[in-house]
């Protein structure tokens, strides 16, 4: 059973690593994620990761309580580095060679982000974890994922969430919400479906970088997705919109 993709970028939210109360780092979750990543790596797939920091700090929340927005965002970037190190440790305990590259220079614990070096790591089948966001305030880690995926030539972005795709409405609030199996970037933006921020979606749209939104918490989903099973919601430049059950 081979992979549909040669090189992928997995976007993980901070909550994928969160402990009780959606805060901190749960090492069991980190090791579970590392096992899922190893299964895909064993298929010969080159893997890059971008991880958020919301389980530790959300810059936008700090800005709301009076901290300067740029300062708050820098604090959030540092949180992503903590998560990246936790994920690196978990992956290496599974025997995976891993490199953390940070957009913010922090040389004693991570490489500085250099595109050509990142590509070389991927070619050598090392896991590359991109941390520190874009290195600039006001940009989300979703935008980081879009930017890095385009820069290092990934085939697809796999956006790992706690829901099994993109819905017509919030399924927690609307029992009639339907899941899209496929939707275009433009429709996602126009309908304000909150898949990613508009900057991230626009970057993917302009560079023809498909996104698949899926549930990372269901064991085996990542491998099934990479091997071609129809899981989650595909967002692409195709204007064909498909809704489950229709």
UniProtKB/Swiss-Prot annotation:
<feature type="binding site">
    <location>
        <begin position="11"/>
        <end position="14"/>
    </location>
    <ligand>
        <name>ATP</name>
    </ligand>
</feature>
<dbReference type="InterPro" id="IPR015963">
    <property type="entry name" value="Uridylate_kinase_bac"/>
</dbReference>
<dbReference type="GO" id="GO:0044210">
    <property type="term" value="P:'de novo' CTP biosynthetic process"/>
</dbReference>
<dbReference type="GO" id="GO:0005737">
    <property type="term" value="C:cytoplasm"/>
</dbReference>
<dbReference type="GO" id="GO:0033862">
    <property type="term" value="F:UMP kinase activity"/>
</dbReference>
<keyword id="KW-0418">Kinase</keyword>
<dbReference type="InterPro" id="IPR001048">
    <property type="entry name" value="Asp/Glu/Uridylate_kinase"/>
</dbReference>
<keyword id="KW-0547">Nucleotide-binding</keyword>
<feature type="binding site">
    <location>
        <position position="161"/>
    </location>
    <ligand>
        <name>ATP</name>
    </ligand>
</feature>
<dbReference type="Pfam" id="PF00696">
    <property type="entry name" value="AA_kinase"/>
</dbReference>
<dbReference type="InterPro" id="IPR036393">
    <property type="entry name" value="AceGlu_kinase-like_sf"/>
</dbReference>
<feature type="binding site">
    <location>
        <position position="170"/>
    </location>
    <ligand>
        <name>ATP</name>
    </ligand>
</feature>
<dbReference type="InterPro" id="IPR011817">
    <property type="entry name" value="Uridylate_kinase"/>
</dbReference>
<feature type="binding site">
    <location>
        <begin position="134"/>
        <end position="141"/>
    </location>
    <ligand>
        <name>UMP</name>
    </ligand>
</feature>
<feature type="binding site">
    <location>
        <position position="73"/>
    </location>
    <ligand>
        <name>UMP</name>
    </ligand>
</feature>
<feature type="binding site">
    <location>
        <position position="53"/>
    </location>
    <ligand>
        <name>UMP</name>
    </ligand>
</feature>
<feature type="binding site">
    <location>
        <position position="167"/>
    </location>
    <ligand>
        <name>ATP</name>
    </ligand>
</feature>
<keyword id="KW-0665">Pyrimidine biosynthesis</keyword>
<dbReference type="GO" id="GO:0005524">
    <property type="term" value="F:ATP binding"/>
</dbReference>
<protein>
    <recommendedName>
        <fullName>Uridylate kinase</fullName>
        <ecNumber>2.7.4.22</ecNumber>
    </recommendedName>
</protein>
<keyword id="KW-0963">Cytoplasm</keyword>
<comment type="pathway">
    <text>Pyrimidine metabolism; CTP biosynthesis via de novo pathway; UDP from UMP (UMPK route): step 1/1.</text>
</comment>
<keyword id="KW-0067">ATP-binding</keyword>
<comment type="similarity">
    <text>Belongs to the UMP kinase family.</text>
</comment>
<comment type="function">
    <text>Catalyzes the reversible phosphorylation of UMP to UDP.</text>
</comment>
<dbReference type="GO" id="GO:0006225">
    <property type="term" value="P:UDP biosynthetic process"/>
</dbReference>
<feature type="binding site">
    <location>
        <position position="54"/>
    </location>
    <ligand>
        <name>ATP</name>
    </ligand>
</feature>
<feature type="binding site">
    <location>
        <position position="58"/>
    </location>
    <ligand>
        <name>ATP</name>
    </ligand>
</feature>
<comment type="subunit">
    <text>Homohexamer.</text>
</comment>
<keyword id="KW-0808">Transferase</keyword>
């Amino acid at each position: 059973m081979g992979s549909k993709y040669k090189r992928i970028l997995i976007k993980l939210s901070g909550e994928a690593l969160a402990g009780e109360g959606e805060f901190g780092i749960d090492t069991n979750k980190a090791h579970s994620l590392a096992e899922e990543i190893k299964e895909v790596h064993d298929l010969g797939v080159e893997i890059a990761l971008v991880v958020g920091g919301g389980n530790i700090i959300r810059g936008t929340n700090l800005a709301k309580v009076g901290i300067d927005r740029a300062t708050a965002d820098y604090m959030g970037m540092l949180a992503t580095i903590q998560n990246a190190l936790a994920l690196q440790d978990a992956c290496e305990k599974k025997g995976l060679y891993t490199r953390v590259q940070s957009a913010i220079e922090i040389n004693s614990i991570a490489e500085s982000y250099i595109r050509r070096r990142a590509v070389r790591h991927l070619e050598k089948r090392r896991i590359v974890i991109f941390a520190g966001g874009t290195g600039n305030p006001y940009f989300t880690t979703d935008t980081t994922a879009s930017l890095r995926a385009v820069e290092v030539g990934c085939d697809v972005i796999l956006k790992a969430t706690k829901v099994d795709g993109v819905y017509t409405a919030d399924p927690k609030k609307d029992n009639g919400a339907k899941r899209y199996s496929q939707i275009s970037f433009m429709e996602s933006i126009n309908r304000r479906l909150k898949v990613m921020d508009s900057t991230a979606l626009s970057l993917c749209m302009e560079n023809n970088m498909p996104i698949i939104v899926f549930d990372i918490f269901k064991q085996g989903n990542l491998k099934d997705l990479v091997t071609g099973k129809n899981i989650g919601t595909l967002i692409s430049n195709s204007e064909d919109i498909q809704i489950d059950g229709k």
